[in-house]
Amino acid sequence: MRTTTRRAPRVGIGGPVGSGKTMLCLKLCQRLRERLSMAVVTNDIYCSEDAQFLIRQSALPAARIAGVETGGCPHTAIRDDTTMNEQACRALEATFPELDLLLVESGGDNLTATFSPELVDAFIYVIDVAEGDKIPRKGGPAIRFSDLLIINKVDLAPLVGADLEVMARDATAQRGGRPFLLCDLKREHNLDAVIGWLEREVLFARTAAPVG
């Protein structure tokens, strides 16, 4: 009898280089791993540094963390040709059929980066205030259409002259009612709100137990 592997709920995490994508993966794993079965797929162009970071930090057991070396443009691997990421996700789902949540971290990319809906069920886009308070105003598909926008590293705003009120106003204008959060992920400021969003918008979709 043929059996099929249950697809785990998948959440994409995108954003520019250094914005805090891997930190978000780490913090979510640390906070949720005791009550959820989790795995992570990371993307880098020429290495697996983000996967190795998560392994060194003991975010999850190493077998639950897979690093994809895309060898090219990051958004191609999450939107245009998702084959490598899909294979990595399916391998983890086959090994851990009880998965409650699978995170897919993109390589660092620009404001046009979005995830294919065939690869993930929802996606979070992470920017940081050190990039300048004009970033939300620039718009682009990632700013406008991500399911959740995180404006990270709010603790740095006074040091770089970024106006958080301006960033919040512009994010509101760009996103048409879609949620955004001001966070300091390293210190877990507003991490509870991110987890609350995951619980409401993604984890409710947890499917039945695997077959076979």
From Swiss-Prot:
GO cellular component: cytoplasm
Single GO MF descriptor: GTPase activity
CDD domains: UreG (cd05540)
One record GO biological process: urea catabolic process
UniProt keyword list: Chaperone, Cytoplasm, GTP-binding, Nickel insertion, Nucleotide-binding
Subcellular location: Cytoplasm
Residues the record lists as binding GTP: 15-22
Chief location category: cytoplasm
InterPro entries recorded: CobW/HypB/UreG_nucleotide-bd, P-loop_NTPase, UreG
Record Pfam families: cobW
Xref: SUPFAM superfamilies: P-loop containing nucleoside triphosphate hydrolases (SSF52540)
Function description: Facilitates the functional incorporation of the urease nickel metallocenter. This process requires GTP hydrolysis, probably effectuated by UreG.
NCBIfam families: ureG
HAMAP family, sorted: UreG (MF_01389)
Subunit-structure text: Homodimer. UreD, UreF and UreG form a complex that acts as a GTP-hydrolysis-dependent molecular chaperone, activating the urease apoprotein by helping to assemble the nickel containing metallocenter of UreC. The UreE protein probably delivers the nickel.
Family indicated by similarity: Belongs to the SIMIBI class G3E GTPase family. UreG subfamily.
Stated name of the protein: Urease accessory protein UreG
Gene source species: Opitutus terrae (strain DSM 11246 / JCM 15787 / PB90-1)
